[in-house]
Regions:
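Surface-exposed short loop/turn segments
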Residues: 47, 51-110, 121-130
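Stable alpha-helical elements in mature extracytoplasmic
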Residues: 37, 41, 45, 67, ...
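C-terminal/domain-edge helix-coil "capping" segments
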Residues: 96, 107-114, 118-160
């Protein structure tokens, strides 16, 4: 079962003006980004679990583990926002984020395992133009890595 997934930005990120502007992130744009990142995590975890031979269910029950996660310290160098101001963003990386993930007994809520990891987008030697599609591609790559780690650890536990 895939449970709650929350997303939080780096503590100063939302307060900083958008690249190339004097405008700050609108609350609705920030929420869309959080929802998109949470959706990517849910999608990739589900895909990896199913590919690994695990059944993903919607309800708690006997012998059901619940995966819950928080993406924290999310930092995006070129956020996708709806704004009249157009600014090109050049950076060495699309951004970074940290995951705090837990496996719980789905009935009792007891935490059986907890893990933390920092994921960073590919870095280049010199700044390059950051696009919205690069943001999503890099975020997906980080999240796919986390999904692979989850399945690998579940497989190792299953063998013991």
């Amino acid at each position: 079962k895939i449970g709650a997934i929350t997303v939080a930005f780096n503590k100063n990120w939302e307060k900083t003006p958008l690249p190339g502007t004097r405008f700050k992130m609108r609350a609705e744009d920030a929420q869309k980004i959080k929802d998109r990142v949470a959706g990517l995590l849910r999608e990739e975890i589900s895909t990896a679990l199913k590919a690994g031979g695990y059944e993903v269910v919607d309800a708690s029950g006997e012998d059901v583990l619940e995966f819950a996660a928080a993406i924290v310290d999310l930092y995006i160098n070129k956020p996708q926002v709806h704004s009249a101001a157009r600014a090109d963003t050049y950076a060495v990386s699309a951004g970074e984020m940290v995951i705090v993930a837990e496996l719980r007994d789905s009935l009792s809520g007891e935490v059986l395992s907890r893990g933390y990891d920092r994921g960073a987008a590919r870095e280049t030697m010199s700044p390059h133009f950051i696009t919205n599609s690069e943001n999503e591609k890099e975020a997906r790559k980080i999240i796919q890595g986390w999904a692979t780690i989850l399945v690998t650890q579940l497989d190792a536990t299953r063998k013991n």
